[in-house]
Amino acid sequence: MAKKKGKGKWRKALKWSDKTLQNAQQTDIVIPIMGATGAGKSTFINLFFDKTVAKTSDSLNSCTADVKDYPGPWRKDLSRRIVLVDTPGFNDSHEDEAEILRRVSVWLAKAYDDGMRVAGVIYLSDIAQKRVYGSTRLNLTMLQKLCGDDFYPRIVMATSHWDEVPLHVGEPREEQLRENFWAEIIGKGGKTWRIITRDDALAAIDSIAEEHRRRGLQTDSGTSTSSSGTTVNEDAIALLLQRELVELDKIIPATGAGKELKGNIRNLLEVLKHEVAEEQDPEKKAELQRKLQFLRSQVKQLNIPLGERLRIIFGFYQV
């Protein structure tokens, strides 16, 4: 039986400049690459292709502003494509968080509505980081809100930048990530991986692709037809965000990811308000006030209109 789909409110968030998956094939193996700015997402994609296809940066200034997909043949089945999806990190150096969420959301919703299913997600963490920063925590929390715990078995939690630290330094950091930050995902089936060489990147991708194929997500069992005419398997596990936007017809601010991001920005607002009140230097105070206004504009983007709040209160999103 086909899953119920809403009217497609997410489409109202689309902009002419948005890049979405083009020339999708039913056999595509779609794998978003996620993580904080500077974690090595573009580098990972270049390892897969064994050449530079995604622009990288040597600093914490992000080179990934848009969601961009990179299709290439799967080495274990040349009739199928691996589609790696480069995503901007939250706490990006150039874009506001609400805009990043919008871009990620419309890409995923469009792919899902067109019948494409995400095979798995690779989340990258920089092992060279001496401590876990607020931006790292935010990106990890957003990963959980975007995916939902039903999808955890299809997440690979990978560490990068091993060439920048000796093993005796990196291994305790990796253990801390596993025990303190990744425990919930790992406990529900998520895998861990070290990305040191190209072979490591290929193996991580293969693990997702092989599991995707093993589960038979592209078989004719339990299929229906999407709005674009593509045959899809309704037994496939989708990202929570995709189900919220396409099946439950939520607007982006009403999703779990939208609410989480708004809460994070509001917390930053409170901290910044205190800094503005205490700052004595006129120039520094003016700069803080500009940042304050910028954060307020993001909160406004993530506000839920009254009509949508009533739908939530009265349970219209229940399936």
Spans of model-derived segments:
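Conserved nucleotide-sensing/catalytic segment adjacent to the nucleotide-binding pocket
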Residues: 54-118
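Conserved catalytic motifs of the protein kinase core domain
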Residues: 29, 80, 154
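"Short basic amphipathic alpha-helical interaction patches in structured regions
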Residues: 87, 99-101, 136-141, 171-176
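Conserved catalytic-core segment of NTP-binding enzymes
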Residues: 142-146, 161, 167
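C-terminal non-catalytic interaction/localization modules
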Residues: 1-64, 95, 99, 150, ...
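Inter-motif core of Ras-like GTPase G domains
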Residues: 94-130, 138-150, 156
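Short acidic, S/G/P-rich loop/turn micro-motifs used as interaction or catalytic elements
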Residues: 90-92, 127-132, 163-166
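Extended hydrophobic secondary-structure segments that form protein cores and membrane-embedded regions
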Residues: 32-33, 84-86, 119-126, 156-161, ...
